[in-house]
C-alpha cells in the first residue's frame, strides 16, 4: 500500500513538473550542468544574502467597508522591517566589480519609523534624483508612502508623475529600488501608479489579527466587486506591541495638513483616469464566468 501511494505521489510530481522533466530527459547534459553551476554559485557568492525583490511596486488597500483600521500601514511597515532586518549589512558579491561588498538597505519614508534608520520623504525628486545619495551599486532603496492617494492628490504633487519619474519607476529593478504604498482604495491613487503596480494586498483586521489577500492589480482595476475575484494568495499574521511601536503616523497626518493643498474634485477625478469597470476587461475567462454566475444567482 505504501509503495502504491509513493508511486502515485511520484507520478503527480512528474505531471506537475512535466515540462521541466521533459527538458531534463531530452537535454540532460545542459540541464544538470547548470543545476550544478547555479547551486555552486548560490553558496560561493552568498546569493542567499542578496535582496532580489527590487523592482516591485506594492499597494496595500482596505478591505470592504473597513476603510480605517484595516491594517494597511502596519502590514506595509511589517514587510519593510522584515526586509531591512533580513538583508541590511549582509555581504554580497558584485558581479561587475567581481568583489564582495556590504549590502545596505536604504529606506525613504513619509512614515516615522522607530528602531531603524530612514530618510524622510519630502517629494518625488527623491525618485528622480536618487543618484545624489551616492548609494553603492549593490545597495537597495525602498520607498515607503503611506496614504499615497492623499500625497499625490495635492497641488504640490500635481505634476510630479513626470516622464522622468515614470522612467525611474519603470526601471526600478535596474536601479535596485522598490516602492511600498497604502491607499484606502486602489482607485484613490493616480492612474499611472495603478497601471505599473505589481501586486495589491487587500487588508482586513480583527483585534490583533490581520488578514491579507493578494490580487493582480488589473483584476481589481476593472472589477465591480473584488469578491468575485479569487486572490493569488492569502496570509494571516498577529500584531504584537513591538510591531505597533515600530512606527508613528502622527507626524504624517500633521505634514499632510500643513504642507499639502488638496486639488479640486475635477483635478482629482482626472488623475484617477477613466475608471469604467467592465466585466469584459477582467483578465481571465474564469473571472467572467464567476461574475456572470453570481449575477444569475442574484436574479433568481
State where each predicted segment sits:
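Phosphate-binding P-loop
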Residues: 50-59, 87-100
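Conserved nucleotide-sensing/catalytic segment adjacent to the nucleotide-binding pocket
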Residues: 112-171
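N-terminal pre-Walker A segment at the start of P-loop NTPase domains
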Residues: 15-54
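Glycine-rich P-loop/Walker A and Walker A-like loops and their local beta1-loop-alpha1 context
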Residues: 57-90
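Feature marks short, highly hydrophobic, charge-poor N-terminal signal-anchor/signal peptide-like helices
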Residues: 1-8
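Conserved P-loop NTPase motor module
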Residues: 213-300
Amino acid at each position: 500500500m505504501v509503495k502504491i501511494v509513493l508511486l502515485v505521489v511520484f507520478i503527480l510530481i512528474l505531471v506537475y513538473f512535466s515540462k521541466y522533466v521533459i527538458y531534463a530527459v531530452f537535454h540532460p547534459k545542459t540541464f544538470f550542468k547548470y543545476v550544478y553551476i547555479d547551486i555552486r554559485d548560490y553558496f560561493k557568492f552568498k546569493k542567499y544574502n542578496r535582496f532580489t525583490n527590487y523592482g516591485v511596486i506594492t499597494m496595500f488597500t482596505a478591505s470592504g467597508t473597513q476603510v480605517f483600521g484595516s491594517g494597511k500601514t502596519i502590514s506595509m511597515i511589517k514587510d519593510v522591517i522584515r526586509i531591512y532586518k533580513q538583508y541590511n549589512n549582509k555581504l554580497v558579491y558584485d558581479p561587475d566589480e567581481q568583489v564582495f561588498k556590504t549590502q545596505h538597505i536604504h529606506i525613504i519614508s513619509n512614515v516615522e519609523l522607530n528602531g531603524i534608520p530612514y530618510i524622510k520623504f519630502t517629494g518625488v525628486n527623491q525618485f528622480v534624483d536618487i543618484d545624489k545619495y551616492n548609494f553603492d551599486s549593490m545597495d537597495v532603496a525602498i520607498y515607503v508612502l503611506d496614504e499615497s492617494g492623499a500625497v499625490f492628490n495635492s497641488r504640490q504633487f500635481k505634476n510630479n508623475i513626470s516622464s522622468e519619474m515614470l522612467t525611474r519607476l519603470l526601471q526600478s529593478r535596474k536601479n535596485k529600488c522598490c516602492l511600498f504604498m497604502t491607499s484606502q482604495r486602489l482607485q484613490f491613487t493616480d492612474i499611472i501608479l495603478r497601471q505599473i503596480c505589481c501586486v495589491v494586498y487587500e487588508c482586513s483586521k480583527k483585534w490583533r489579527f490581520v488578514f491579507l489577500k493578494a490580487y493582480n492589480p488589473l483584476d481589481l482595476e476593472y472589477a465591480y466587486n473584488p469578491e468575485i475575484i479569487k486572490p493569488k494568495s492569502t496570509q494571516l499574521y498577529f500584531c504584537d506591541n513591538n510591531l505597533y511601536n515600530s512606527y508613528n503616523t502622527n507626524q504624517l497626518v500633521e505634514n499632510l495638513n500643513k504642507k499639502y493643498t488638496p486639488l479640486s474634485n475635477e483635478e482629482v477625478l482626472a488623475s484617477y483616469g477613466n475608471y469604467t469597470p467592465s466585466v469584459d476587461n477582467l483578465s481571465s475567462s474564469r473571472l467572467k464566468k464567476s461574475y456572470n454566475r453570481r449575477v444569475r444567482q442574484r436574479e433568481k
